[in-house]
Each structure stands twice: as structure tokens, then as C-alpha cells.
């Protein structure tokens, strides 16, 4: 096989990766859709609840996510999850829907990522016994690279969440320390006032 033919074939065999990455604020319910063109593709899904709109409240209850197939069938569901990952093989081509539900009274910021992996393998164009294994190795390598990228994005979202949690905890610790300090000062003033009143009362009784 010529070099030109090899390059053309590589272009045909190279996998197509469709990715949806979004960070959004949810009130009650939000739905997104993603189209799968081929059966047998792999859909990777992940989400992380990054933060709440109230610095005094950080939601530990999580959100719900329900995945529906092209005909409305339920593929998978997550209940009250702060973060999760899931992947499945596309059984039917078409539009897949991802619906989030927030049961918290606060708005939540969610990092959502969908990756669709597809490898167009044309066996009729690759009869060479040395060329076919090469294409299989390329396919596995690219899939591994995209999986690493997917995992990295999920870990970055987890890191963002933890940073916000730590920041909120630090603010709460500072506010708590200030409150306790003011409470201690107030208690000291009250104690001085009561002792002074008691002393004045005893002094008045001794004069009588």
C-alpha cells in the first residue's frame, strides 16, 4: 500500500469524538440532549455539583440525573449525587436526553460533561495483515487519550468544588471566631455591669 493511500485510509479510520461540556446554574430542573449517530458507540457522562448560591449553605444532598434514550426509555439514573460518572454503549442511534433535578431551595452550579466515542473501521479497505493491527492499536490509543481527557476534566471539576468548600469553611470559621469573640466581650461587659450594680447595692446597704 502506498504512503498516499495510507494517509487517506488513516483519515477515514480516525475516530470521531463528540463532546459536550457545560457549567450551568440550576434552579429546579434542566435538560440537555446529545445525538448519537451510530449504534455501538460509547457515551461517557460525568457531573459535579460545584457550589451553591448561598455561602452559608453547601448542599450535601446532591442532585438527580435521569438519562433517557431516543424512544424515551430510561437508560440510567442518579439520585441525590454530588458527583458521578457513568458510561454505556449506545443501543439505538438518536437523541439522548439528560435531565437534572435540584431538590435544594438554593441554586446550584453544576459542571456537566458528555463524551461520545466512535471509531469508523472500514475492514474492506484494510486487507493488509500488518495494516489492520496498526489501525486497531491507533483506535485503542486514541480512545485511551480521550478517556484520560475525560477523567482530567472530571478531576478538575472536583478540585474546583473542593476549593470552594474549603473557602466557605474558612469564611465560616472566621465568622464563627468573630461571633464568639463578640459574644465573649459582651459577656465580659455584662459581668462587669452586674458586679458593679451588686457592689453599689452592698455599699448603699452598708451606709444605712
From Swiss-Prot:
The protein, known as: Transmembrane emp24 domain-containing protein p24beta2
Keywords: Coiled coil, ER-Golgi transport, Glycoprotein, Golgi apparatus, Membrane, Protein transport, Signal, Transmembrane, Transmembrane helix, Transport
Compartment annotation: Golgi apparatus, cis-Golgi network membrane; Golgi apparatus, Golgi stack membrane
Chain segments annotated as transmembrane: 177-195
Motif COPII vesicle coat-binding: where in chain: 198-199
Lumenal compartment segments: 22-176
Organism encoding this protein: Arabidopsis thaliana
Lineage: Eukaryota, Viridiplantae, Streptophyta, Embryophyta, Tracheophyta
Annotated GO biological process: protein transport; vesicle-mediated transport
One protein family per Pfam: EMP24_GP25L
Boundaries of every GOLD domain copy: 29-116
Protein task: Involved in vesicular protein trafficking. Mainly functions in the early secretory pathway but also in post-Golgi membranes. Thought to act as cargo receptor at the lumenal side for incorporation of secretory cargo molecules into transport vesicles and to be involved in vesicle coat formation at the cytoplasmic side. Interacts with p24delta5 at endoplasmic reticulum export sites for endoplasmic reticulum exit and coupled transport to the Golgi apparatus.
Glycan-bearing residues: 168
Domain notes per entry: The cytoplasmic C-terminal domain contains an Arg-Val motif, which is involved in the anterograde ER-to-Golgi transport of the protein.
GO CC terms of this entry: COPII-coated ER to Golgi transport vesicle; endoplasmic reticulum; endoplasmic reticulum membrane; Golgi apparatus; Golgi cisterna membrane
